[in-house]
Amino acid sequence: MTLDLIKIRRDLHQIPEIGLEEFKTQAYLLERIAEITNGKDFVEQRTWRTGILVFLKGSRPQKTIGWRTDIDALPVVEETGLAFASQHEGRMHACGHDMHMTIALGLLDTMVQVQPKNNLLFLFQPAEENEAGGMLMYEDGAFGNWQPDEFYGLHVRPDFKVGDIATNTSTLFAGTCEVFITFKGKGGHAAFPHNANDALVAASYFITQVQTIVSRNVDPIEGGVVTFGSMHAGTTNNVIAETATLHGTIRTLTQDMSLLIQKRVQEMARGIATSFDLEVDVTLKQGGYLPVENNSQLAKQLMTYFENASAVNLIDCLPAMTGEDFGYLLNKIPGVMFWLGIDTPYALHHPKMSPKEEVLSFAVDNISGFLKTRTN
């Protein structure tokens, strides 16, 4: 069948749902998948919570190729002014996952026309933004005997033009780790500081000291990011704060560097707590947000294919400090992720982010050609 990719994208754009709550999205996808695969006896499918797996059994399979798309949205109030804007208050496909899903359906529609030689798995994965859905599915055994031998996926990128595909042969995205810290002292009257223990002061010293991790503990060639974007302490001007809570992020291009920075953050927090004679609780949450590390051999093959595709402008790009839970799956299964240009002035997660829709047919045409080289 011939899909109306723009209509599908706009349908999906109107029903954004956050991770593990993608019920309408899953229902819509299942309807389209049923239409696409109708009468194809070599296709099987199953669901995992709000996720979907579609398996094309190869005619003479030697391996299984995987294509992954994420399906969740963000808690963002849309400001695009589009006629097909979000119908779910406070929810928006501001990270382009509506584009990802549409491309995946287009690829499925193309690849199902002729039974491939090798197996081909399409993964419609929930909860990329908040719960590392790829990790949850893998750890729960959702793949079973459909687990790919090679895994591929993409992410849209606003500052690249339609026709641009960008990747590299090493790390594409950073690993991310959330940091939650609570300093607990003793509250009291501002006039009697000697009878209290000010958690706000301790937290302030920590915020200053933690800046030295990147400047003095991290190899400048490797790099890293430590950012605390939230600090809450105290209730009014004349009461000494009993507690101070901090929420931050660690971003690195290698897991070893992430572990080093996590270790130093904990050591500094405990050191500050000791020096101020108060308590501290440190919680680190990395989960499935490992660095997205491309398999060098598979990446070279993918880049060679797109380099020879006349419609594609291939870019050998530097890593980005954005995070992606596909990193967990690529830590378990060799594969490649790449950027797809969508040419919009607004960044990912911006309430006015609006991709150029002509990229949909471009992506389906060119990526399906690559998948055919892997499955035949």
Curated annotation (Swiss-Prot):
EC number: 3.5.1.47
CDD domains: M20_Acy1_YkuR-like
Gene Ontology BP, a term: lysine biosynthetic process via diaminopimelate
Coiled coil regions in record: none
Entry keywords, A to Z: Amino-acid biosynthesis, Diaminopimelate biosynthesis, Hydrolase, Lysine biosynthesis
Catalytic activity: N-acetyl-(2S,6S)-2,6-diaminopimelate + H2O = (2S,6S)-2,6-diaminopimelate + acetate
Active site: D70, E129 (proton acceptor)
Pfam families assigned: M20_dimer, Peptidase_M20
GO molecular function: N-acetyldiaminopimelate deacetylase activity
EC top class, as a word: hydrolase
Pathway given in the UniProt record: Amino-acid biosynthesis; L-lysine biosynthesis via DAP pathway; LL-2,6-diaminopimelate from (S)-tetrahydrodipicolinate (acetylase route): step 3/3
Organism superkingdom: Bacteria
NCBIfam families: amidohydrolases
Functional note: Catalyzes the conversion of N-acetyl-diaminopimelate to diaminopimelate and acetate.
Record family assignment: Belongs to the peptidase M20A family. N-acetyldiaminopimelate deacetylase subfamily.
PANTHER family linked to this entry: N-ACETYLDIAMINOPIMELATE DEACETYLASE, PEPTIDASE M20 FAMILY MEMBER
Protein name as catalogued: N-acetyldiaminopimelate deacetylase
Organism: Streptococcus mutans serotype c (strain ATCC 700610 / UA159)
